[in-house]
Structures are given as C-alpha cells and as structure tokens.
Amino acid sequence: MVSEQIIDISGPLKGEIEVPGDKSMTHRAIMLASLAEGTSNIYKPLLGEDCRRTMDIFRLLGVDIKEDEDKLVVNSPGYKAFKTPHQVLYTGNSGTTTRLLAGLLSGLGIESVLSGDVSIGKRPMDRVLRPLKLMDANIEGIEDNYTPLIIKPSVIKGINYQMEVASAQVKSAILFASLFSNDTTVIKELDVSRNHTETMFRHFNIPIEAERLSITTTPDAIQHIKPADFHVPGDISSAAFFIVAALITPESDVTIHNVGINPTRSGIIDIVEKMGGNIQLFNQTTGAEPTASIRIQYTPMLQPITIEGELVPKAIDELPVIALLCTQAVGTSTIKDAEELKVKETNRIDTTADMLNLLGFELQPTNDGLIIHPSEFKTNATVDSLTDHRIGMMLAVASLLSSEPVKIKQFDAVNVSFPGFLPKLKLLENEG
C-alpha cells in the first residue's frame, strides 16, 4: 500500500449525501445470514475490503453469497452443513472478522486457521482467547496473543464472564461462541459498548437478554436462528468525517441521510452538542437499529470538551477526527480513558498526534488519550495514513483547514471502510 493522494478540496461544503452502510452491522448480518438455513437479503451493505473478507470466508464454508445491485443475497445450507475449509481463512485488515470468527468457529467446532495481514498480526488477540479458553474452546495463537489462530473441534461450555475492557469485539466473540453451548452464558460489562450483536441476534430470532451492563444467553440458542432480511443503516463512523468537515469549514451546510444512531454508537453527536456545534437530527426512525438524517452547519467558537468515561466507547472509532475538531475549539480539550485506541489498526493515540502535529496542530499524547490545544494548520508536510483508514480520512478532512493541497501517503487504506470517500467529499465542494 504505497499510493499517494493529493487532496485539494476547499469549502464551503454544501449538499445532501448518504454514507456507506455500517461496517459493524454488515459483518454481523453476513455472519448471521450465513448461519441460518435459507435465504436472507442484506440491503445497502458496506462492500469495503473488511466486509469482503468476511464474505469470502463464509463462501469457503459453503455459503452462496451474491452481490445484486445494492444488496447481498445470502443462500445458506445452514451452519450444520458448513464444510471444513482446506485453506487458511484470510481476514485481511479486519479485526472484526478475526475476533468474531474466533468465537464463531470455536463454537462451531470447525477445524480452521484464521490469519490476516501484517497489521492484524500485530493486534492483540489474548483478550479474545482468554474467555474462549474459559469456555473450553480449543484455540491457540502465536504466544497466546497473535494470529494466526488455530481452531480445533471442542464442546463449548457456558461461563459467567466479567469483561476486562469495554470492547464490543470481545463481547461478540463470546456471544457467537455461546450460541453453540447447551449452558447459559452471562457477560458483565465494564461500560456500555456497541450492542449490534445483541440487537441483530434478536433480528435473526436468537433469544438473548440484555440489561444495561449484563447480557445473558439461552442454552442451545443457535437452534432458534432463522433467515431474515436486514436493511443496513449508514455508518455513523463514516458520517463523522463529514460532520467534522462541515463544522470546521466556513459557510458549510451538509445533510447526511439514513445514518445509524444506535445510542451505543452516537457519541459523536453527544460530543458535538456539548461543544456547541450546529447539528440537527430529523427524519428519525425507531427500531432495533434507529436512523436519522443529520444536518450540520459551520460553527465557529466551538467550546472545549473533556471526553471520558462511558462517552469513550460510544465514540471510539471517531476519536481521531474528533481530535481534529477539538483543535478548532476556543480552549484546551482532553480525551481520557481511551487506551483502546492503542490496539486499533495503528496506535491511534500516537498516529493522530504525530500526523496532526506534522501539519502544525498542537496535540500531546498521553497514556490513555490526548491533550488538544487550540491550533491551526501551519505547514504542508506530507503525511501518511500508516495504512489506517480512519487516519487517512481524518487527514483529508484536516486539509480543508489549509489553503494549499495536502499530500497523503498510503491513502488507499480508506477503501477498508469507505470506497468512494474522496469523490463524495468533492461532490459537496462542487455543490457548494
């Protein structure tokens, strides 16, 4: 991944757009539709590189998945008819694919090997392996912490598990494994984390009880699964880049339609409101996965903010671009309790600070977050996504604060979650 992209976009940004389907929900919809015997339609899925890795793996297990315009048609023989794969299951750059399938394949008892790219090979897997081994999963990694993960058949038992980190991926790995146990599993969370697995289990007829910080599964829950059609809302993590772009670019007025606003994911909306940003939600729908249209207008004199506690997991993937937003506030902002950023595609505490500081902004990395001072774009250094899609898009948004073009190395990383990101940003420039 060595592509360079020159970003030359100026404001104001004006217009109405949709963003690609939610990445987290697309992964889970493919997994659940594949487990269920019969046909499921997944509408407006995200077909970035990460979700394609998930699709490819289920095809190897014997599931027929067809792309049909803006939907996926999943025809599955059901989990009981899955084939043993006779090759390594390649997860690419996808932590979601790797960690959730570690649980799912352990539960299924299918002999398999999960392995990803160089970035995935550096990301910790012990947080998933520990609870799975407590469930009697036969799963091993390099140094008990890294891919490749080798899975062998076993009989999964239920556990009572106190989460060590607020991680939806760890929680979901346990939940997927627990589907195949004839015991009850109880998970106690530290903080609220995204709950798409729980809401989508119900959508596919799998019984599950969820209170605020406690989740309980039913014995032999997999036997209840049924195929279902699912409409994937727009990804709020992708919408975040346009929300921030409109807030920091004079005279901008942007509306994003059909964005998922699940309360476990909508931290960026809470943060923008606390900072005094001009943001309005309308056309709201309710249901398992609520949606809204979001209108954002340029807002000078944003108020500084401290982001900590339960707000952090609700905005974890958006924190790099939120850090950029905080540079435009009238005082110093702080992000705390965000150690989870260290184990993303890159250490996002360091990469966010390093890349924005190169451009003249003033950010100090801390052990669990960032201190962000009011600062401006001062120098047109060449920056680098470091193969992290969210860093690449954040830097493209930062370029709106420069009067000169900005060169970003390894920009094609954005295709992981948002193919067509740059043309969509340019569309708003042209409509302005």
UniProtKB/Swiss-Prot annotation:
| Residues binding 3-phosphoshikimate | 23-24, 28, 167, 169, 317, 344
Q: In which pathway does it act?
A: Metabolic intermediate biosynthesis; chorismate biosynthesis; chorismate from D-erythrose 4-phosphate and phosphoenolpyruvate: step 6/7
Q: Which residues form the active site?
A: 317 (proton acceptor)
Record GO biological process: amino acid biosynthetic process; aromatic amino acid family biosynthetic process; chorismate biosynthetic process
Localization (cell): Cytoplasm
**Key words of the record:** Amino-acid biosynthesis, Aromatic amino acid biosynthesis, Cytoplasm, Transferase
Q: Does the keyword Amino-acid biosynthesis apply?
A: yes
* Known EC number: 2.5.1.19
Q: Which PROSITE patterns match?
A: EPSP_SYNTHASE_1 (PS00104), EPSP_SYNTHASE_2 (PS00885)
Q: What reaction is this protein's catalytic activity?
A: 3-phosphoshikimate + phosphoenolpyruvate = 5-O-(1-carboxyvinyl)-3-phosphoshikimate + phosphate
Question: Where is coiled-coil annotated?
Answer: none
For this UniProt entry, the molecular function terms from Gene Ontology, in alphabetical order, are:
3-phosphoshikimate 1-carboxyvinyltransferase activity
The primary location reported for this protein is cytoplasm
Which parts pass through the membrane?
none
The record ties this protein, via Pfam families, to: EPSP_synthase
Concerning InterPro entries, the annotation shows:
Enolpyruvate_Tfrase_dom (IPR001986), Enolpyruvate_Tfrase_sf (IPR036968), EPSP_synthase (IPR006264), EPSP_synthase_CS (IPR023193), RNA3'P_cycl/enolpyr_Trfase_a/b (IPR013792)
Q: How does it assemble?
A: Monomer.
Family recorded in the similarity comment: Belongs to the EPSP synthase family.
State the function annotated in the UniProt record: Catalyzes the transfer of the enolpyruvyl moiety of phosphoenolpyruvate (PEP) to the 5-hydroxyl of shikimate-3-phosphate (S3P) to produce enolpyruvyl shikimate-3-phosphate and inorganic phosphate.
Name the UniProt record assigns to this protein: 3-phosphoshikimate 1-carboxyvinyltransferase
Name the source organism.
Staphylococcus aureus (strain Mu3 / ATCC 700698)
